[in-house]
Amino acid sequence: MKEAQEEAAGSQTNLLQGTLDMLILKALALGELHGLGVARRIEQITRGTFQVKPGSLFPALHRMEESGWLTSSWGESENKRRAKFYRLSKAGQRQLAAETAHWRRISLAIASALAAG
């Protein structure tokens, strides 16, 4: 049983690597956030299923900003510290729509496979 749980935990990590961009885009589609706010929002919208570590989050935010999917500006966080705030760009909105459609197709296919007799 423990081995199956460890395997499931490893699978969750692999799934997160494949979905991190989509989760970041979705979190920011709900409003501007600083980096740690993005991590908190992802945890909220996935009901605690995904907890993004800073070592994964910040390189992804940087890469997505370089790709033109996000824009950013410096501001002050709720605890009065300087923080970089991220917003979804038009290109990011298009990317989110494409990734959402892709994951809906995958979800339907997996649900269909699991329901097969």
Stretches found by the model and what they are:
Residues 26, 40, 62, 97, ...:
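A cross-family signal for key residues in well-ordered alpha-helices
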Residues 58-60, 65:
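Conserved RNAP core-binding helix
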